[in-house]
């Protein structure tokens, strides 16, 4: 059965914040900097003009505390909960660790074939099979190869309680690329037990592939770069993917026109798939991902080049899906989840996006009238991932040389 998301649900939980008004999209851009304001704005349109005028609306703050659970994680990237409540955590340098009963230990991995660790490259996301309690399968994304030729790979292994055994590479992204940027790499599962994998566009200018800027791969349907891919749990391609019958397109593609998605969440209740995506200088995006749709990069974008000037003359087009939210200046979003727990009743149904540059978690509420309201939760470290734990608390991984696992708890 072809997977189709439901329509956007109404989020009715009250927002307990102080808020200020801002239009969501802007044609200007500055060097990325922290933005610790709380923002409200209309549904994105190409003509929106940014403002910072407070509307003097006061609401009671939600009280919470930040608890440091673990310190000294080396560049942690992803996390996944085992049925017993233990947490598997990846470190980009090639390690998997387990936090169990307050103790952090390294997990042995039989082999990660040809792993490439440099810049943004290395061991990245981790996810459990939906039927992990029956098959013990764990999925890892990582960069393989070397600086001259590399790609994102998906490794599947079994967790025997102490080690990851029987590793098997079930998928390698094509074409190969050079450099050490834009691997994407988040994994989420759909209700039919197929998985979506976010793949980056390959890197920034002047990096090229086949004589043109590599980022143009995001618009090419014969390339897996700059895409969200949909695969079966063995790495094979579902027969109902949107481009399977297009002989000039790659059949693994689910959506395209992406720069570098590092936040991806599939909500089993609404059956919606949300993604946060890095822009260049500004133009970070929150998108609702749908099968077969084009999200614009680099043909349509609010980003500016790092060297100056606009990436694209267009910020909207009829054949391109508009983002639900755009951040300028950049927050560098990474990690995304939609809260469905009971610990924070007022936050239920809200999205939470990690932010590397602004070193915060952004709480996002989309109201019935399509107004988007944001609260920023300062963390003070680069936020790589944010997840809801099995206990209903919110967990945050910080991307530092001495990274931390932080838990948000109500007071």
Where are these regions (language model features)?
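Surface-exposed loop and turn segments in beta-propeller and other repeat-based domains
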Residues: 108-121, 167-183, 224, 231-254, ...
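Acidic, Gly/Ser/Thr-rich repeat motifs that build Ca2+-stabilized beta-propeller blades
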Residues: 30-203, 263-266, 272-279, 329-369, ...
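N-terminal secretory signal peptides that target proteins for export/translocation
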Residues: 1-11
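Short, conserved, GDST-rich strand-edge loop motifs in beta-rich repeat architectures
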Residues: 197-221, 283-285, 289
